């Protein structure tokens, strides 16, 4: 049965059961901020399941486009995992329930009129306490007990483990249907979820029956198609294999199921399909949110191509194949193939330009590890390679193994947890009815009165424990709080002058109080239409319903307004000096500090930055009026107000105008006159991602302080480098290059003579000078310093200290290398001993780094005409480095260099390993090196004897 036929049969079958056929929801549901992508068929019905919205029908059926990345590492490796897939579903909103859902699933699967799957090939699971579902399967369907498995809540409850672990909200047991493959293994094809409980609190007795029970079922289209078509994987079904074949042709690689390239072609197929569907819906690859997921998918596919020796964009050539394979159900894909192809090709080009950078970064990392005698690739480094260059950890691990390094998976996962919210693809759908949702139903909204006033009399409407910043809000709604505590609480008032964080502007701070209590507000957030005050009760006790005074910190609010108004002025200046294409891509407004992201393909040079800054200061100095008006969207457009693409604006809306030069739709707080911005200073201009730049700037007193700090910095740098301030920037560059040169010489084993202290001869270097009387010249020099040192201005001096310390260590190590350089492979062979037919060499080689020691071992093995076992060691700065090698004939006898070196490393407080013929390790206790060498000598002598 073809995939298109299966899809239609499913929908038609459930139409015969009274279900209304509904279209697939979009991949990125703008109405649902809890997910990045639609992860399941029921997502579009969340509000209906919760009873918030009433439908004209109580039964529905859909085929939903879904995208998840939770199992991304399995894509291409397993038979059934995808990122993009289609989920067939049938739903009940307080209508049919368990018995009908089970009967209809069985009928559709086994009746010859529909799929005709032999019933004896099917087994089911139920939740261990769901006797009702067990009884239906056993007594009414007729399945024998041995084909019905009772499972724990982690397997057969939705959400998984909800009874014991939460979250609170709608939940229920589920029943899964499995098909037995020819090899005897089972594949899940259908999941029936019986949402019949509302979880409240901790067990026991925390599952309360819902007055209206619901059904949510899902059948994987691709999995079921593979079963019906009798193919080994989802990738071999009629709607996917043509894309696999197209990928094989485009990549110039034969498709073989079991090969590494076969896995790569399957992964390319999946990621191409996901990217085409997403970009078709205007989800372009980018740095944040859903866009970052699409970027990751495209880059993973490109890396697979890179490993098959492709060096030019290729993925975009599969767009037509994806559209053609999907045309029966999604003919609209064919209308946007050119736009989608161009977007994917552009991302490929950008990534191909960074792949080499990523590989160079890996090689530099390996060199540093050799220098430091490290044996494990740090997880944080691998995470940075993934997030910066898109290099997957699996590739890093493979390359590391070739260098006898291991890989820190736990550290990698810990580092990647910081990116989870933007990379997990929103794979879970939770019906959590937390305290804010409960409060919202009663309060509806919190009117904001802060445009007109910074102090207001209000009534406490909600007291909530916790800060609510985790993935699930487990806070409690209280009626009162009797004593102060350090934990963060949340207050909701009937109205508020506090601005809740939105539009890039951070929330207000201040105090909410009366005679009975004082609540310090440390942050203000928006939750839908409610303003939520985060803070601590520092005095007294607080009760719901009491009247209080909400007072915003005016000084902080004014500093925010300075930065926000300056952001609008900066936006105008960018249009003037960079171009109209420099549109806002994101912003953050903090007290007297702003961050503004905008579209631009290249860096802004210092000369243009000065012009932008002077233009902003000129508009500030004019003292134009800043005003805001509530207008209709139509009037705002007619007035030429700037609107951000893709942003949803209310109608009517708030338009902020500055003189005659700027009009933007904005809900933030502003000054009343541009002159109130005071000073303005650009401190950073940098890349955020391909095609997106970022400017950070300061306003008010912070800008003045930064200016003074900048003017003083060159003198401080000059003092550290013992040179004139006019050449301090050039001296810093010379120091960086000298440290790099020292590392290279140390790595290669070359020894040169360097003075103990850093000396910069400006005349000999023909150094470029800075006019220290010209602030713009000074600032340009300081910006150059921060770029070369890759630090903020506040960290320049500490980074210089670090570089000078590194230089001193490297010079000292080079002296040791000079001593070690007198050793040769012939010397080591001469000092070796014969154990049976084997030449055994165990020696300390002072000053030698792992590269040098590996070189000696290779030379010894080539020179020796007998079996050879070599272990060399050196120590620097109390760190021990060990490298061991065995000739091929010893490896064939079952000996392993990794075991030998690893045992010696334990003696010096370290660890290591590698290939059977070559391994290295590091240690922390240089005092025990003689003991380690003696043990290595005795261990190998015993093995050879």
UniProtKB/Swiss-Prot annotation:
The keyword Thylakoid does not apply. It comes from the Bacteria. Binds 1 zinc ion per subunit. Pfam families: DHHA1 (PF02272), tRNA-synt_2c (PF01411), tRNA_SAD (PF07973). Its EC number is 6.1.1.7. Its main location: cytoplasm. Signal peptide: none annotated. Its cofactor is Zn(2+). One of its GO terms (biological process) is alanyl-tRNA aminoacylation. Residues 911-945 are annotated as: Disordered. Disulfide bonds: none annotated. InterPro entries: aa-tRNA-synth_II/BPL/LPL (IPR045864), Ala-tRNA-lgiase_IIc (IPR002318), Ala-tRNA-ligase_IIc_anticod-bd (IPR018162), Ala-tRNA-synth_IIc_core (IPR018165), Ala-tRNA-synth_IIc_N (IPR018164), Ala-tRNA_ligase (IPR050058), Ala_tRNA_ligase_euk/bac (IPR023033), DHHA1_dom (IPR003156). One of its GO terms (molecular function) is alanine-tRNA ligase activity. It is found in: Cytoplasm. GO terms for cellular component: cytosol. Catalyzes the attachment of alanine to tRNA(Ala) in a two-step reaction: alanine is first activated by ATP to form Ala-AMP and then transferred to the acceptor end of tRNA(Ala). Also edits incorrectly charged Ser-tRNA(Ala) and Gly-tRNA(Ala) via its editing domain. Consists of three domains; the N-terminal catalytic domain, the editing domain and the C-terminal C-Ala domain. The editing domain removes incorrectly charged amino acids, while the C-Ala domain, along with tRNA(Ala), serves as a bridge to cooperatively bring together the editing and aminoacylation centers thus stimulating deacylation of misacylated tRNAs. Belongs to the class-II aminoacyl-tRNA synthetase family. This is Alanine--tRNA ligase. It comes from Rhodopirellula baltica (strain DSM 10527 / NCIMB 13988 / SH1). The lineage of its organism: Bacteria, Pseudomonadati, Planctomycetota, Planctomycetia, Pirellulales. The gene is alaS.
